[in-house]
């Protein structure tokens, strides 16, 4: 496979320092130690490796500054974005404002979403996933 794809669904928990261990299969798709986390469009956190983030950023930066909706999307995505490092044990620190945005307390579900991964509060994800199955 030439293309990187983030796949799967994994249950994890935050530790007392708000770190989560990234699933091995997610880490295998990442070539570097630095990631970008940002607010998702649903109540979740988007996670990107450098290449995926650069592609996502380019899409938004190509939108003319005169495009009101494009400007709003750009502000939404970039203002919440933070660089985080993967430590030697495969953990990342979940920034407080992103944790709060996604209503994450302890138990999370990490899902692959193709070109990025997402971190959800486990109960929120379970409810959302049930709705996906019904529709």
Which residue stretches match the model-derived regions?
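Flexible "stalk/tail and boundary" regions
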Residues: 1-12, 16-19, 25-84, 88-89, ...
């Amino acid at each position: 496979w030439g293309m990187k794809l983030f796949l799967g669904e994994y249950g994890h928990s935050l530790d007392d320092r708000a770190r989560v261990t990234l699933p091995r299969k997610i880490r295998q798709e990442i070539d570097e130690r630095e990631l970008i986390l940002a607010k998702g469009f649903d109540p979740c956190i988007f996670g990107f490796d450098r290449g995926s983030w650069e592609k996502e950023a380019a899409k938004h930066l190509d939108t003319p500054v005169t495009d009101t909706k494009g400007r709003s999307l750009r502000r939404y995505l970039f203002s919440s974005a933070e660089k985080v490092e993967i430590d030697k044990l495969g953990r990342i620190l979940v920034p407080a404002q992103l944790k709060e945005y996604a209503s994450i307390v302890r138990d999370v579900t990490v899902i692959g979403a193709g070109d990025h991964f997402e971190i959800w509060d486990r109960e929120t994800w379970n409810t959302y996933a049930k709705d996906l199955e019904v529709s």
